[in-house]
């Protein structure tokens, strides 16, 4: 019995991955990341990788960030959309958790009032170290539309330290996902002992 093959057909070639395009460079995010370039060069030269414990922990941490929502207003809808199948933030290692004790990242989305500020700080204090905060939307960043109201905190950075600011009213799910990727890049850049 002979194997029948078509020798006239060209071999199948997988398409190039596109990824999310960086609006500043027009290239996929991470395409010019020195971390990935050095890894591919080292693998090509030696066939194995050498690293420090710090770099290994940072690599593992960026691929397994657990986030907790602190949705206060309309921005929370866009935050939910980021978890849906169209954007699927879990493919970047960014999975939701229901408890602050299991979370690495808190996303503050919406208007933070003076009455809610102590609760935000309490939830932040319950998160294990290292902990990160993403401020999402104009209201969380600086008070937004309600900036001059007597009952609104003019930015959640007055209550908790913020690592990434995502602008917009409300910001799109793509903008939040870009903020998550920037947070992962920031974690790779910084040490594990000191933030």
Swiss-Prot record:
GO terms for biological process: aerobic respiration; electron transport coupled proton transport. GO terms for molecular function: 4 iron, 4 sulfur cluster binding; iron ion binding; NADH dehydrogenase (ubiquinone) activity; NADH:ubiquinone reductase (non-electrogenic) activity; quinone binding. One of its GO terms (cellular component) is plasma membrane. It comes from the Bacteria. PROSITE patterns: COMPLEX1_20K. [4Fe-4S] cluster binds at residues 74-75, 139, 169. Keywords: 4Fe-4S, Cell inner membrane, Cell membrane, Iron, Iron-sulfur, Membrane, Metal-binding, NAD, Quinone, Translocase, Transport, Ubiquinone. It catalyses: a quinone + NADH + 5 H(+)(in) = a quinol + NAD(+) + 4 H(+)(out). InterPro entries: NADH_UbQ_OxRdtase-like_20kDa, NADH_UQ_OxRdtase_20Kd_su. Belongs to the complex I 20 kDa subunit family. NDH-1 is composed of 14 different subunits. Subunits NuoB, C, D, E, F, and G constitute the peripheral sector of the complex. This is NADH-quinone oxidoreductase subunit B.
């Amino acid at each position: 019995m002979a194997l029948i093959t078509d020798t006239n057909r060209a071999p199948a070639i997988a398409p190039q991955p596109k990824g999310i395009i960086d609006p500043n460079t027009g290239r996929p995010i991470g395409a010019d990341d020195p971390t990935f370039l050095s890894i591919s060069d080292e693998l090509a030269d030696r066939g194995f990788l050498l690293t420090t414990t710090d770099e290994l922990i940072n690599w593992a941490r960026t691929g397994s960030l657990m986030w907790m929502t602190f949705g206060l207003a309309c921005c929370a809808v866009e935050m939910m959309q980021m978890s849906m199948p169209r954007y699927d933030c879990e493919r970047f290692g960014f999975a939701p958790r229901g408890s602050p004790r299991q979370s690495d990242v808190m996303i503050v989305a919406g208007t933070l009032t003076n009455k809610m500020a102590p609760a935000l700080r309490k939830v932040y204090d319950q998160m294990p170290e290292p902990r990160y905060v993403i401020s999402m939307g104009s209201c969380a960043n600086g008070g937004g539309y309600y900036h001059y109201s007597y009952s609104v905190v003019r930015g959640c950075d007055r209550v908790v330290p913020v690592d990434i600011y995502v602008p917009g009213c409300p910001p799109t799910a793509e903008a939040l996902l870009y903020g998550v990727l920037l947070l992962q890049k920031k974690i790779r850049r910084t040490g594990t002992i000191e933030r």
